[in-house]
Amino acid sequence: MSSLAPCFTVGSIVRCKTCFGDNISGEVVAFDLGVKMLIMKCPSSNGGGDEQTTCNVTIVNLSLCMDIEIVKEAIPPAEVQQPEPIDLPMIRERYRYATEHRTLSCRSYHPNASPFGQALFRLLVKRFGDPAIIWQNKGDQVAINILRQVVIDAPYATENIRYLDWNPKLAICVQEVVQNFCSKQF
């Protein structure tokens, strides 16, 4: 293959022979000259005849191709449709959600807490809100502190719940959450 790779148009049918002896042919889906990669939609090997509905998507490194042949050049449409406008509010919402989810995952990790305790921590954060739940160090063990009123010691079961300030509504709510979580885990 020459140092200047040919430019492929999307929709063209291309046949490539790799340095490993593989023959790959299919329709061009994407092409990047900078990294010399070609993404092709190849017919699936499970048959299907003329009504072929499944395809394999193959990524070809053009640096490893010995021979490239354009079997059929795609004819560009006379009128190109403009792409749909980007929905920025939706993208911002997805970004916010992903950031919150990763932050929660990072906050729920504690090296001295069991995976069970970390999962309970994440559930409590979803139930009571992010700033309401914190880890509380106790030597080699770590406890979950809820609203600075309730502490759940390891191994994080209903019998390990301690109340610093008695709040009957909070006590019942925390007990139900922990009980439901424990019953689903075992």
Curated annotation (Swiss-Prot):
Coiled coil: none annotated. GO terms for molecular function: RNA binding. InterPro entries: AD (IPR047574), Lsm12-like (IPR039683), LSM12_ABD (IPR019181), LSM12_LSM (IPR048478), Sm (IPR047575). Belongs to the LSM12 family. May have an accessory function in the survival motor neuron (SMN) complex. When it was originally identified as the potential ortholog of GEMIN6 this protein was named 'Hezron' after the 6th generation descendent of Abraham. This protein is produced by a bicistronic gene which also produces the CG6709 protein from a non-overlapping reading frame. Interacts with Sbat; along with Sbat and Vlet, may form an accessory subcomplex involved in SMN complex function. This is LSM12 homolog B. Residues 1-74 form the Sm domain. Residues 84-186 form the AD domain. The gene is Hez. Pfam families: AD, LSM12_LSM.
